[in-house]
Structures are given as structure tokens and as C-alpha cells.
Regions:
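Bacterial N-terminal signal peptides that target proteins for export
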Residues: 1-10, 20
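Expand to "…catalyze enediolate/carbanion chemistry for C-C bond making/breaking, isomerization
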Residues: 14
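Core of compact, soluble alpha-helical bundle domains
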Residues: 23-150
């Protein structure tokens, strides 16, 4: 029941953030002040992403999407991305989300499972709930580039 509530809440938040970003004509919102620090700066984000990719590989819902992935390279790219989104000094140098996910046949439920794994990882790392929500709001607009199958 709790997982269903969280998934629905998350889907609503993702939808609202995506609609808000489209209404403002922007790809992503500016990073809220203090978010980079709340995630432990680059070191904290790197530790979070190292744990996150291991959990993605271990979760039966998300594991098939990461069978052929280089987990250390994935963690590095995600670290760059979250560091940049959170207002840190990093620059994301990877491919676009659309290009990376275009041929993976990702459905909304797959995306929601990944977000649940991310939330569990952030909880395990002690990231405050408010900081988690601010980061998820920054990531939400990527949904339209990641979900490629109805």
C-alpha cells in the first residue's frame, strides 16, 4: 500500500513538474539554493550514484535495462548530471537522455521503478526528504525523453 501511494504521489509530482516546465518553456528549473550541499556536494553525489547503480542492477524491475551497462561509467555520468542539476560546478558531458534511452522500450512503470530505487537510495544515504523532492522536481522533465513506449 505504501509503495502504491508513493508511486502515485511520484507520478503526480513528475506530471506536475513536467507541465510546469513546459508552461515556462524551459527544459529544467534552476537548482534551488543549498541543494548541492544537501546532497553532500560532489563526493556525496558520487557515493549516492555508486550505490544507486548497484541497486538498479539488483532490482528485478530495473535490472534488465542495465545488463550490458558499465556501472562505473553510468555512475560517473549520473554524478555529473546530478552535480550540475543541483547547482554544483560539474558539467554533464554525456549523451542526451533521448539518445541514450531511445531504443530501450522504457514504459512509465519502468521509469517509476527507477525513481523508487533512487528514493530508497537517497533515504539510505540520509538525504533530507525536502532535498529529495527538489532533486526529483529537477529530474522530472526528463521523463518525456526516457519513457519511449506507452
Amino acid at each position: 500500500m505504501k509503495e502504491t501511494f508513493i508511486a502515485r504521489l511520484l507520478a503526480t509530482a513528475i506530471t506536475l513538474a513536467a507541465v510546469n516546465a513546459q508552461a515556462q518553456g524551459t527544459a529544467a528549473a534552476a537548482a534551488p539554493a543549498g541543494l548541492y550541499a544537501a546532497f553532500g556536494e560532489r563526493t556525496g553525489i558520487a557515493a549516492l550514484m555508486d550505490d544507486f547503480v548497484l541497486r538498479l542492477k539488483a532490482d528485478k524491475r530495473t535490472a534488465p535495462f542495465f545488463e550490458k551497462s558499465n556501472l562505473s561509467e553510468l555512475a560517473r555520468g549520473l554524478t555529473e548530471q546530478l552535480c550540475m542539476l543541483s547547482g554544483g560546478p560539474c558539467k554533464y558531458t554525456g549523451a542526451s537522455m533521448k539518445k541514450v534511452h531511445d531504443d530501450l522500450d522504457i514504459r512509465r512503470r519502468d521509469f517509476n521503478a527507477l525513481v523508487e530505487v533512487l528514493q530508497d537510495t537517497m533515504d539510505a544515504k540520509g538525504i533530507p526528504f525536502s532535498a529529495q523532492n527538489r532533486m526529483l522536481a529537477l529530474l522530472a522533465p526528463m521523463h518525456r525523453d526516457v519513457v519511449t513506449k506507452p
